[in-house]
């Protein structure tokens, strides 16, 4: 990692040593291990508003927000109250509950094209189930996905995935057989002409196109104007379904997610959506949903099987309902403004130190590519950055009490709890971090190593 000298964190270091003895790599999701930036991961013991506190008693301004879910900030009173009330009533029943009906109704109300929705436990389950449903509905097998887009760790979608696969520099992953990905076509993101060419050749075999509504697992790479609408058009022409992965963008970009800022305005809709993160309020909850005729193929109404013992868990549902109900227009305005503030502070500091970088955003999701490129529109562009400079920047900010994603290929997040005091702390820390990044010798571009949905 060049000139990076991670600071000491004795309690976290001891916890990490213990974890490595009993947990593969010492963590339960790869990007948390700090492999992309070096040093020892911080073991957090509490969160409050925009802050995290680690096992050594140090407090950090949190710009990860649990990889997106904590849009209200940590330990928001309404969420804590709802979860406490739910726990006191029992943790799981294995039956339908009133809360899951209310959460489904709220999702359907907020995202117009979603006529019916099924609750699950993770984004991976949601995308896996949506792909199975698309195949069952169309009677076709082929799926188109885009390099650098991450749709969970389901085998068929791990080909050229972003997030953790990118963070660790893995081309793919052992254990995923050729048979598992034989029906997956991976294309460059934002290249509509190539998608059209593949449809022209194989359109009658393609069940669905799955895409992140705005890519945020190779760093943040928004869709080029017309790209998502073009996918909709091609799917219509060839009888395929369009699946919008809004696990990261859903209910964070707006009340109706990325679709609310694009498709709703342009008058087009995906056939299926996947959701997660914000909709669970920090607890394990996700969903997939869409057109009623497509969802009608799902068991027990139809023949496409999907199930889950803990799906619709009452505690997760309570957290999700409380979070979504608290996400008012004022909350979204605050989050949007704070994202602009942080991006501006960091970009100014890097510019003043002559560090080549490219800020990139999709709504309130943002990241920085350490590159002199004028634009990054796909995975290849995201990979061609100087990630060692990010590592130096990361550790300087960490030492100053600012917690960033431990990978150059992950999105940054803010919450409605981030206030002027947090902006002042970030502004105070950024110049030294920019100097640390500038001190790293200009390397040859290195392959990306993104995280994975934390």
UniProtKB/Swiss-Prot annotation:
One of its GO terms (molecular function) is glutamate-1-semialdehyde 2,1-aminomutase activity. GO terms for biological process: protoporphyrinogen IX biosynthetic process. The keyword Isomerase applies. Pathway: Porphyrin-containing compound metabolism; protoporphyrin-IX biosynthesis; 5-aminolevulinate from L-glutamyl-tRNA(Glu): step 2/2. It is found in: Cytoplasm. Keywords: Cytoplasm, Isomerase, Porphyrin biosynthesis, Pyridoxal phosphate. It is an enzyme of class 5 (isomerase). One of its GO terms (cellular component) is cytoplasm. Its cofactor is pyridoxal 5'-phosphate. It comes from the Bacteria. Coiled coil: none annotated. The modification N6-(pyridoxal phosphate)lysine is found at residue 277. Its EC number is 5.4.3.8. It catalyses: (S)-4-amino-5-oxopentanoate = 5-aminolevulinate. The keyword Repressor does not apply. Belongs to the class-III pyridoxal-phosphate-dependent aminotransferase family. HemL subfamily. Homodimer. This is Glutamate-1-semialdehyde 2,1-aminomutase. It comes from Frankia alni (strain DSM 45986 / CECT 9034 / ACN14a).
């Amino acid at each position: 990692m060049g000139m990076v000298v991670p600071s000491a964190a004795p309690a976290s270091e001891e916890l990490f040593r213990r974890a490595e003895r009993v947990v593969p790599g010492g963590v339960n999701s790869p990007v948390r291990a700090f492999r992309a930036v070096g040093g020892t991961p911080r073991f957090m013991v509490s969160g409050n508003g925009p802050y995290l506190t680690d096992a050594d008693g140090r407090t950090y301004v949190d710009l990860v927000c649990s990889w997106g879910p904590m849009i209200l900030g940590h330990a928001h009173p309404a969420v804590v109250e709802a979860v406490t009330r739910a726990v006191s009533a029992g943790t799981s029943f294995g039956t339908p509950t009133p809360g899951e009906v209310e959460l489904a109704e709220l999702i359907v109300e907020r995202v117009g094209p979603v006529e019916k929705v099924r609750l699950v436990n993770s984004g991976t389950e949601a995308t896996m189930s949506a792909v199975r449903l698309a195949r069952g509905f169309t009677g076709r097998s082929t799926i188109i996905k885009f390099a650098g887009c991450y749709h969970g760790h389901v085998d068929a979608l791990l080909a050229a995935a972003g997030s953790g696969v990118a963070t660790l520099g893995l081309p793919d992953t052992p254990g995923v057989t050729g048979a598992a990905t034989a029906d997956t076509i991976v294309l460059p993101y934002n290249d509509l002409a190539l998608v059209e060419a593949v449809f022209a050749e194989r359109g009658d075999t393609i069940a669905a196109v799955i895409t992140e509504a705005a890519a945020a697992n190779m760093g943040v790479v928004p869709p080029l104007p017309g790209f998502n609408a073009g996918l909709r058009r091609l799917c219509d022409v060839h009888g395929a379904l369009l699946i919008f992965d809004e696990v990261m963008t859903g209910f964070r970009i707006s009340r109706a997610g990325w679709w609310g800022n694009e498709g709703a305005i342009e008058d087009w809709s995906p056939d299926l959506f996947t959701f997660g993160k914000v909709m669970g309020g920090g607890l394990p909850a996700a969903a997939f949903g869409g057109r009623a005729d497509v969802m009608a193929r799902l068991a027990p109404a139809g023949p496409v099987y999907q199930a889950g013992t803990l799906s619709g868990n009452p505690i997760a549902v309570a957290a999700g309902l409380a979070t979504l109900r608290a996400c008012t227009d004022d909350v979204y305005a605050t989050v949007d403004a704070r994202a602009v503030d942080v991006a501006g502070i960091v970009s100014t500091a890097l510019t003043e130190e002559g560090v080549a970088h490219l800020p990139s955003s999709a709504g309130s999701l943002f990241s920085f590519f350490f590159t002199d490129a004028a634009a990054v529109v796909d995975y290849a562009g995201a990979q061609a950055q100087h990630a060692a400079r990010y590592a130096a920047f990361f550790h300087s900010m960490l030492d100053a009490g600012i917690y960033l994603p431990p990978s150059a290929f992950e999105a940054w997040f803010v919450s409605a709890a981030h206030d002027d005091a947090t902006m002042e702390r970030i502004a105070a820390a950024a110049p030294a971090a920019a100097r640390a990044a500038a001190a790293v010798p200009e390397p040859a571009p290195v392959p990306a190593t993104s995280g994975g949905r934390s």
